[in-house]
């Protein structure tokens, strides 16, 4: 899985899932920096100052040391230092992420439900991007919220492939 986002006029971020690498490049393709502190990274969002990345992982290297999680999490990366400065635990296997008006919206899939001891997720987590504190989880009533979380103004769209068998 791969995600690409333009942070500002000078910087692009790319997640390369399973390699655990987040690559930062210039618009002309030159390598600027990279981090391997966010294992099993998935999707990206930005406010222009920070990059936010969802992760299926259960640990993360931060400026304060390693942090562990029971579920998935979102990491906040400073684009000046390329270091993880904060994290927030969300639901199992968070996927799509969007930034809007100071908040992060994170679609939780629970996508490993078929092989781990938990159910598919039905929630979107809302995080205060400034404090990286979880504000609430909204139950959508749909399982396995998978893929890119698309934003158009105040509206968010995400797909739900169900459980791939019985639930559409």
Region spans (language model):
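A short beta-strand motif characteristic of beta-propeller blades
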Residues: 1, 29-36, 83-88, 133-140
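Repeated scaffold domains used in trafficking and secretory/extracellular systems
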Residues: 1-7, 39-48, 92-100, 142-152
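Blade-loop segments of beta-propeller domains
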Residues: 1-17, 21, 31-43
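Conserved core beta-strand positions within WD40 beta-propeller blades
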Residues: 10-11, 50-52, 103, 155
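Residue position within the beta-strands of beta-propeller blades
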Residues: 14, 53-55, 106-107, 157-159
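Short, solvent-exposed loop/turn segments at conserved positions within beta-propeller repeat blades
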Residues: 15-19, 60-72, 113-122, 164-168
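Hydrophobic/aromatic beta-strand positions that recur at structurally equivalent sites within the blades
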Residues: 24-25, 77, 124-127, 168
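Loop-centered beta-sheet repeat module
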Residues: 91-126
């Amino acid at each position: 899985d791969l995600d690409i986002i333009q942070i500002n006029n000078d910087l692009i971020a790319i997640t390369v899932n399973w390699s655990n690498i987040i690559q930062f490049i210039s618009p002309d393709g030159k390598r600027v920096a990279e981090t391997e502190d966010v294992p099993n990274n998935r999707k990206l969002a930005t406010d222009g100052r920070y990059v936010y990345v969802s992760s299926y992982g259960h640990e993360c290297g931060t400026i304060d040391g390693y942090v562990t999680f029971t579920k998935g999490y979102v990491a906040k990366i400073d684009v000046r230092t390329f270091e993880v400065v904060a994290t927030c635990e969300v639901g199992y296997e968070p996927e799509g992420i969007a930034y809007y008006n100071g908040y992060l919206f994170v679609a939780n899939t629970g996508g490993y439900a078929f092989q781990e001891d938990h159910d598919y997720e039905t929630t979107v987590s809302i995080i205060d991007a400034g404090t990286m504190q979880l504000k609430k989880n909204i139950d959508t009533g749909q399982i396995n919220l998978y893929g890119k979380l698309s934003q158009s103004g105040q509206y968010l769209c995400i797909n739900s492939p169900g459980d791939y068998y019985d639930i559409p």
